[in-house]
Amino acid sequence: MSREETAGAPARVAALEDEIERLRAEVKAWKDLVAALPVREGVEFTNLSDMPLEPAYTALDLAQGPTADGMPGSYPYTRGIHPTMYRGRLWTMRQFAGFGTARDTNARYKFLLARGQTGLSVAFDFPTLMGYDSDHPRSEGEVGKCGVAISSLADMEDLFAGIPLDQVSTSMTINGPAAIIFCFYVAAAEKQGVPISKLQGTIQNDILKE
């Protein structure tokens, strides 16, 4: 902080305190008004998590427990996982991609990475999303469409062949088979000599997605 900024700090604090007092008076006047008006009886107002909702929120509510947010790069990571946020590192650039066989998609990933993409986002085909192998009768006509077909560890190895998994983060959009796909990914990384502690990315575990 510069000397000028330090010198002006008391004035800014005083102005902020005045603004808080003004807002408190405004909130009190509003609550007095609401108390005189009829409301629906027997109705509970909650959000989707069934938590009760106040009639209105203001900046004053932010002052209730601000220390719980922590600092950028520190637990509980409410303010991001990077200490410098996006000033020191841009967000990951990744195109949702996947089609045909694992080798087809592998070539696409290498194409994207060579042109500046900084992460991978795997699109799986419908049989993979539903947990069916490519040779299952229910997979007929859907293999490799709208995503890559992954039926085995060998497929996962082909998908990331020549792509060092300790140097790229991977986002995988999957349904119920998430646990199996994750194990495939970890095993493929280990075969590259990459320990699980060096892996980056996310995996979706949403059985209602498709």
Question: Model-predicted segments: where are they?
Answer:
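Catalytic alpha/beta active-site cores
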Residues: S2-E210
